[in-house]
Curated annotation (Swiss-Prot):
InterPro entries: RemA-like
HAMAP family for the chain: RemA
Range of residues in the leader sequence: none
Name of the protein this chain belongs to: Putative regulatory protein Pmob_0099
PANTHER family from the UniProt entry: REGULATORY PROTEIN SSL2874-RELATED, REGULATORY PROTEIN TM_1690-RELATED
Family in the record: Belongs to the RemA family.
Pfam families: RemA-like (PF04025)
Length: 95
């Protein structure tokens, strides 16, 4: 129930499909990027800028973003709270 999340440069992901947002600095994540690239599941949406976060989806896709993981996480939380506000309003109207 996270809606659509802006991950920078006009790129959007479906929040409910994301399973992890991680920093790309560790060696295991660098290997994960290579594997995703070999499988055709790497999406680079950083417009040539330094990759600051990998977004891993439930379909096995790895999305490289130039936005910090903390910023993307904050966007997730804000979307969640916004959706909850709307749902609370609807619940009150129904009852």
């Amino acid at each position: 129930m996270y809606g659509l999340i802006n991950i920078g440069f006009g790129n959007i992901v479906v929040g409910d499909r994301v399973i992890a947002i991680v920093s790309p600095t560790s060696q295991p994540l660098k290997r994960l990027k290579e594997i995703a690239e070999q499988q055709g599941k790497l999406l680079e949406v950083n417009h040539g800028r330094k990759t600051r976060a990998f977004i891993i989806t439930d379909s096995g896709h790895v999305i490289a973003s130039a936005i910090q993981p903390e910023t993307i996480t904050n966007r997730f939380l804000q979307n969640y709270y916004d959706i909850e506000k709307v749902l609370d309003k609807i619940r009150k109207e129904v009852l």
